Amino acid sequence: ATHFENAVSQGYHITMHCDIDQVDSIDHIKQALEVIGVERLDHGTNIVENSDLADFVNQKQIGMTTCPKSNSFVSADMKGKEIIDLLAKGIEVSVNSDDPAYFGGYISENYWALAEAYDLSVDQVVQIAKNSFNSSWISDQQKRNYVQEIDDFVANYDFERETV
């Protein structure tokens, strides 16, 4: 972990790519969290298999990026149930794109695929969007500003149906 500690001391943020459904996924996630001390986990939805690690991520407010469209290339599904479980636990899970040209989906397509397949509510989609800012490495003031923009949009938008 020495190289990572050196990077942090120089002001860099640490994230780890923890592929889904791999051999020893939980061990990889645990190492990223406990040994390396990441500030964010990319992919890593297998964390729902270990409540202690999920609780740790929630307590430490470690963000988790997910990429539903690319998940379906390496797994039987897009891991929507796991994403929803993480969201329900209060974990700062966000939806992102992952090499859009290769996996066929920019961020909007990833949101749409997840919302459509799992019948997400507006509140769930809004929370995922807020999580993307709250778990980012922008300043706290920028986070507040962007989250307020989301709140303002939602307050002024006439949603025609309860689900997106």
Which residues are covered by each model-predicted region?
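Short, basic, glycine/proline-bearing loop/turn elements
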Residues: 36-40, 63-70
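Conserved, mostly hydrophobic/aromatic
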Residues: 41, 64, 98, 139
